[in-house]
A protein has these predicted regions:
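Short sequence/structural segments immediately N-terminal
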Residues: 1-110
């Protein structure tokens, strides 16, 4: 009987530790750090650029039946003030189509 209680106690503690750690996976997602870094970058610029809302961003290219989530990290695509910034925050060079309509992977292949 005592042996069964020991196993139950150990498995309960392990379960609680796993349950407590699980929400941390979302907190430490790589894309969040890119968004925090972007917000720090635009906060230090003389131009007024709206900081990014923290979260997954996507472009739904309906005509191509494709969803691109590149803009979750590549946040400065439209910002002319970021033309000299490092990747992934650099603004995109002039293109002849609206990337919000066609997305990124159609040209960049993923």
């Amino acid at each position: 009987m005592k042996n069964g209680r020991t196993y139950f106690a150990i498995s309960s503690v392990i379960f609680l530790v796993v349950l407590a750690i699980s929400p941390l996976k979302d907190f430490f997602r790589e894309w969040k750090w890119y968004q925090y870094e972007y917000n720090d970058l635009v906060g230090g610029l003389p131009q007024r650029i709206k900081p990014a809302d923290i979260g997954i961003k996507q472009i739904w290219a309906r005509k191509l039946d494709r969803i691109d989530r590149c803009v979750t990290c590549h946040l400065g695509l439209k910002e002319k003030a970021l033309v000299e910034s490092k990747e992934p925050f650099r603004s995109h060079p002039q293109i002849y189509h609206d990337f919000e309509e066609l997305g990124c992977t159609i040209c960049h292949e993923g």
